[in-house]
């Protein structure tokens, strides 16, 4: 994270080491699990014994290596938006905890945890043969365990989580907005997200900018990019305002929003002025094009709907409202989730 603090956000290491003997299997897996969060992710080497360090050399752990790399690709919309933020503000992508939590003296000497962008705390396993990992959660907000149904912890404490070789300890920050590809991307250059899954954790009022362009040319300098501002506010009634601008037409056909709320269940969900259908059966929800479902296990609302900004004649106009609600080069729509108290028996 030191390079990011020094104004070079696109940092990264040669995964597995560039020279010298190949690392043992466990070390290589853990190295990849860390590397997938580095803006510059590269597995290559020139070993002194005329070998190379590549994933296919570790056949017993190939699935774990593949899983970590696929996670990186699913998080591509989040990473690309962080790259855009870095280009505009200089903000690091891999962030030392002290960058975000300067009022917590406990993070001043923390060297092995970091934030991936603003919202994801990563605590890679760094001890061989480890079965647990102690994680310090910075004070000032709540944290939600990515790997354990968003189990919630107060900040300002050290917790201990169980780990196996496949585990990458990750925690979402209260107020998080994390976009991911619904479809599995296999290439940053050739593949595009045809669906977006956005995980949100209401708490503090929050604004996030989701950025996209063609990823290849400099046409973004001519305005061929799309910036979608996502504004989340409210507690009993959470409103998420989407407002997009730009000339670039993305590929997103389907939207999915996952909203975590541990202390209350949802009452109703609306997209614009339309109240969405509530599905009690997960399979029926999965088969539907639009609606919402509540996971008792995660304590999270899952909302899905076709991207309302899709224009059949012009590809996809971005996350937005139906065509009559277009503004110049952009669209707006509001997703509302009610966590208000409700009376089932009319008393």
Locate predicted features.
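Solvent-exposed beta-strand/loop surfaces of large extracellular or lumenal domains
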Residues: 146-165, 268-302
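Surface-exposed beta-strand edges and their flanking turn/coil or helix-capping segments
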Residues: 23-26, 46, 55-56, 108-111, ...
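Catalytic-domain carbohydrate-binding cleft regions of carbohydrate-active enzymes
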Residues: 1-167, 172-173
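N-terminal start-of-chain detector that recognizes signal peptides
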Residues: 69, 92-97, 106-108, 200-204, ...
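Short amphipathic alpha-helical surface micro-motifs
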Residues: 1, 21, 76-81, 103-106, ...
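Residues in intrinsically disordered, low-complexity segments of regulatory proteins
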Residues: 30, 55, 142-145, 210, ...
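Accessory, solvent-exposed terminal regions and/or long lumenal/extracellular loops of proteins
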Residues: 172-274, 283, 295-299, 304-311, ...
């Amino acid at each position: 994270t030191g390079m990011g603090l020094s104004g070079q956000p696109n940092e990264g290491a040669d995964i597995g080491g560039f020279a010298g003997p190949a690392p043992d299997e466990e070390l290589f897996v853990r190295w990849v699990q860390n590397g997938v969060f580095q803006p510059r992710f590269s597995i290559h080497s020139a070993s002194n014994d005329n070998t190379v360090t590549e994933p296919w050399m570790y056949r017993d752990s190939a699935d774990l290596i593949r899983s970590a790399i696929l996670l990186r690709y699913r998080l591509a919309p989040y990473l690309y938006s962080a790259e855009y933020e870095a280009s505009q503000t200089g903000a690091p992508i891999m962030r030392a905890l002290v960058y975000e939590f300067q009022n917590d003296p406990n993070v001043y000497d923390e060297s092995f945890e970091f934030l991936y962008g603003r919202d994801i705390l990563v605590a890679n396993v760094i001890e061989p043969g480890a079965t647990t990992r102690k994680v310090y959660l910075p004070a000032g907000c709540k944290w939600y365990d990515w790997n354990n149904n968003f189990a919630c912890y107060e900040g300002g404490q050290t917790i201990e989580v169980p780990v196996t070789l496949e585990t990458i300890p990750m925690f979402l920050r209260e107020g998080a907005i994390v976009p991911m590809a619904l479809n599995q991307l296999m290439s940053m250059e050739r593949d595009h997200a045809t669906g977006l899954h956005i995980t949100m954790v209401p708490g503090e009022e929050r604004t996030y900018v989701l950025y996209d362009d063609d990823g290849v040319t400099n046409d973004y300098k001519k305005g061929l990019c799309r910036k979608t501002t996502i504004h989340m506010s409210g507690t009993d009634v959470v409103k998420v305002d989407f407002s997009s601008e730009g000339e670039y037409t993305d590929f997103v056909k389907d939207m999915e929003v996952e909203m975590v709320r541990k202390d209350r269940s949802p009452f109703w969900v609306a997209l614009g002025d339309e109240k969405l259908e509530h599905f009690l059966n997960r399979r029926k929800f999965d088969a539907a094009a639009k609606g919402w479902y509540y996971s008792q296990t995660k304590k999270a609302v899952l909302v899905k709907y076709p991207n309302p900004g899709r224009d059949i004649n012009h590809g996809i106009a971005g996350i937005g409202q139906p065509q009559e609600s277009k503004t110049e080069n952009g669209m707006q729509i509001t997703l509302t989730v009610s966590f208000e108290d409700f009376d089932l028996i009319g008393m």
